[in-house]
Curated annotation (Swiss-Prot):
<feature type="glycosylation site" description="N-linked (GlcNAc...) asparagine; by host">
    <location>
        <position position="111"/>
    </location>
</feature>
<feature type="signal peptide">
    <location>
        <begin position="1"/>
        <end position="19"/>
    </location>
</feature>
<dbReference type="InterPro" id="IPR002896">
    <property type="entry name" value="Herpes_glycop_dom"/>
</dbReference>
<dbReference type="GO" id="GO:0016020">
    <property type="term" value="C:membrane"/>
</dbReference>
<keyword id="KW-0472">Membrane</keyword>
<protein>
    <recommendedName>
        <fullName>Envelope glycoprotein D</fullName>
    </recommendedName>
</protein>
<keyword id="KW-1015">Disulfide bond</keyword>
<feature type="region of interest" description="Disordered">
    <location>
        <begin position="331"/>
        <end position="364"/>
    </location>
</feature>
<keyword id="KW-1160">Virus entry into host cell</keyword>
<feature type="disulfide bond">
    <location>
        <begin position="176"/>
        <end position="273"/>
    </location>
</feature>
<feature type="glycosylation site" description="N-linked (GlcNAc...) asparagine; by host">
    <location>
        <position position="347"/>
    </location>
</feature>
<keyword id="KW-1133">Transmembrane helix</keyword>
<feature type="glycosylation site" description="N-linked (GlcNAc...) asparagine; by host">
    <location>
        <position position="103"/>
    </location>
</feature>
<dbReference type="Pfam" id="PF01537">
    <property type="entry name" value="Herpes_glycop_D"/>
</dbReference>
<keyword id="KW-0946">Virion</keyword>
<comment type="similarity">
    <text>Belongs to the herpesviridae glycoprotein D family.</text>
</comment>
<keyword id="KW-0945">Host-virus interaction</keyword>
């Protein structure tokens, strides 16, 4: 609302100009009709030149501007951070950007391919799971895990074949999965590092993540700048190289304390969170609900770090690989997995006659993610857990105090002016009745 009022005042369209002129003229006529017959109380303190200046100020423009300013300050308490983020890129820019990692051509037709299901079937016996935990609010974290991509590329290089690849990040919810980042690569040279390809699709991101997420230098990891608690949960990275898929899961935990520079994220929106059935039917096309952001990796990362520091964040010295979660047997009963019989159960021997059946070995259970996934209500909005109210920062307290002070000062000023004018008019009316004269020259 404040931003709209500011735009209308700085660069108003013709219709708004006409309406403003009529409103200002009407206010001026009503004001001057009340006060024109009475010398204002400040007349003794100003000369005629000052009064001429005051009349220009009272033609409605200054009043309208003051009204906009006061209203904007009062209504900006909850929207100042979002407005600042919306226009910060136009005000400041990083001093320099790193050179591109490689040159490539973007072809839109590669976005027309349906997205394969991120839900893993019983053919996958081993999935790497990493643990990422933020130690404090407003922290920049990284989802990094090494893979066996190099061995696949060496195999392709020995066969002297180019390859195509696709990298997709998902946010796994209890009943669906939301793609948050997707890019396809074509005509790739296996002798070079992964993703150094001649052609690629549009770089697609979930819109709410563009200013707070970017790929790492090798384009395999994901960096999140000041994620909110609603970003906690399970993330899945799917790398597909010539039909072969590599899955990596990241269990992310963000503190519940409020971060003033974080955006709340809703990953459970049914328009983006797709069920296993939708993936299996080939109905998921990321082009329909993800936004384009075709910036090179280095430039995008520079922007994210710049905005993070601009908002008051502290950059980490270095990003480290996420800690691996060790497990002894294949996963079972995990979101995104079909029921898989435990290897231990399969190799179990029958008990000897006369002996009691020993207690069967329990299959390995993945760690529950219920405490990591925010609940969704009927309108699909994130419900934050009940926590102690955060301490109000000094900057917010000062801002609210100034806002209230300006609002009270404006109301008092308007009230005093109206009171003086009405009182002068009343005195003039009494004098007129006493003199029993139709007019009174002043």
């Amino acid at each position: 609302m404040p931003a709209v009022l500011l735009v209308l005042y700085v660069n108003p369209p013709p219709s708004v100009c006409i309406l403003t002129q009529k409103l200002s003229l009407g206010l001026y006529n009503q004001w001057w009709r009340v006060c024109r017959s009475v010398p204002p109380p400040w007349y003794v303190f100003f000369n005629k030149r000052s009064m001429s200046t005051f009349k220009l100020m009272m033609d409605g423009r200054l009043v309208f501007a003051m009204a906009i300013a006061i209203l904007s300050v009062v209504l900006s308490c909850g929207t100042c951070e979002k407005a600042k983020r919306a226009v910060r890129g136009r005000q400041d820019r990083p001093k320099e950007f790193p050179p591109p990692r490689y040159n490539y051509t973007i072809l839109t037709r590669y976005n027309a391919t349906a997205l394969a299901s991120p839900f893993i079937n019983d053919q996958v016996k081993n999935v790497d799971l990493r643990i990422v935990t933020a130690t404090r609010p407003c922290e920049m974290i990284a989802l990094i895990a090494k893979t066996n991509i190099d061995s696949i590329l060496k195999e392709l290089a020995a066969a002297q074949k180019t390859y195509s690849a696709r990298l997709t990040w998902f946010k796994i919810m209890p009943t669906c999965a939301t793609p948050i980042h997707d890019v396809s690569y074509m005509k790739c040279n296996p002798k070079l590092s992964f993703a150094m390809c001649d052609e690629r699709s549009d770089i697609l991101w979930q819109a709410s993540l563009i200013t707070m997420a970017a790929e790492t230098d090798d384009e395999l990891g994901l960096v999140l700048a000041a994620p909110a608690h609603s970003a906690s949960g399970l993330y899945r990275r799917v790398i597909e190289i010539d039909g072969r898929r590599i899955y990596t899961d990241f269990s992310v935990t963000i503190p519940s304390e409020r971060c003033p520079i974080a955006f709340e994220l809703n990953f459970g929106n049914p328009d983006r969170c797709k069920t296993p059935e939708q993936y299996s039917r080939g109905e998921v096309f990321t082009r329909r609900f993800l936004g384009e952001f075709n910036f090179p990796q280095g430039e995008h990362m520079t922007w994210v770090k710049f905005w993070f520091v601009y908002d008051g964040g502290n950059l980490p010295v270095q990003f480290y690989e996420a800690q691996a979660f060790a497990r002894p047997v294949p996963p079972d009963n995990h979101p995104g997995f079909d029921s898989v019989e435990s290897e231990i159960t399969q190799n179990k021997t029958d008990p000897k006659p006369g002996q009691a059946d020993p207690k069967p070995n329990q299959p390995f259970k993945w760690p529950s993610i219920k405490h990591l996934v925010p609940r969704l209500d009927e309108v699909d909005e994130v419900i934050e857990p009940v926590t102690k109210p955060p301490k109000t920062s000094k900057s917010n307290s000062t801002f609210v105090g100034i806002s209230v002070g300006l609002g009270i000062a404006g109301l008092v000023l308007v009230g005093v002016i109206l009171y003086v004018c009405l009182r002068r008019k009343k005195e003039l009316k009494v004098c007129t009745e006493r003199l029993d004269s139709p007019t009174l020259d002043l």
